[in-house]
């Protein structure tokens, strides 16, 4: 994609990285994955908040989330999923001001270790 004026990482994703896509959103691999298969679902339109998306975008993102879940279950057989919305500019980085949904596969006997990206400061 062409660079946009706001230099958003999610607006400028590489088509080569796309796992799946529809008219309103895309599934991408999370570059700093917390577990095997960790992915993000993003709306194609640069938008800051889940509460600002249209009904069509909401349905599209839900469809992509379900598709990602089904594909991850098939490929990696996780025990479950941690699903998190990053809504608003809460972390102060270039990605956080573009709404995105993390789908993080959870595996038996593998604790989820969150870091400062999630507002968690290690002791």
Per-range role (PLM):
Residues 1-123:
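HIT superfamily nucleotide-processing domains
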């Amino acid at each position: 994609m062409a660079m946009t004026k706001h230099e958003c990482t999610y607006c400028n994703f590489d088509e080569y990285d796309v796992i799946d896509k529809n008219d309103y959103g895309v599934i991408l691999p999370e570059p700093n994955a917390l577990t095997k298969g960790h992915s993000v679902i993003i709306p194609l339109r640069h938008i800051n908040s889940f509460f600002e998306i249209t009904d069509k975008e909401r349905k599209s993102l839900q469809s992509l989330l379900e598709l990602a879940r089904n594909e991850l279950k098939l490929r990696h057989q996780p025990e479950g999923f941690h699903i998190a919305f990053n809504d608003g500019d809460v972390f102060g980085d270039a990605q956080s001001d573009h709404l995105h949904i993390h789908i993080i596969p959870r595996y038996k006997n593998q604790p989820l270790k969150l870091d400062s990206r999630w507002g968690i400061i290690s002791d």
